[in-house]
Amino acid sequence: MSSPQLDRSKVWTGDLNARALEPQPRLTVGLHDTTLRDGEQAAGVVLSPEAKLRIAQALDEAGVDRIEVGDPRASDEDSNAIRLILEAGLRAEIWGFSRSARADLEALVELGLRSAVVDAPISDVLL
């Protein structure tokens, strides 16, 4: 799509007007979905590793850019779900979630997660 150009010999306007007529870069919005971690915290919701894989596949097919899969140290089932999702070869970035404790971070690395949201509470009770 081309924009009309101002003929500066006929019309004088400020630079902001000229910039408004220039083609603008296309803006994109990325989606970070937390259903597999945060969604499972709702009362009565328990998802099997296979169900989490199906949800991750559906999110990927829907074009979600980043899927937060959870904390591998929360349970063996969560760790297994993360492994299944990583092995599925999805286009979306797969992100873990972890406390800032060394063992928790090492569990992310051991599974092969390349990115994570790291919770860093300031309360001694939560550390």
Where do the language-model regions lie?
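Acidic (Asp/Glu)-rich catalytic clusters
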Residues: 83-89, 105-117
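Short, well-ordered coil/turn segments that N-cap beta-strands
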Residues: 25-29, 63-65, 90-94, 112-114
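N-terminal amphipathic alpha-helix/helix-capping segment at the start of soluble metabolic enzymes
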Residues: 1-46
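Glycine-rich, proline-tolerant flexible connector loops at the mouths of alpha/beta enzymes
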Residues: 64-90, 120-127
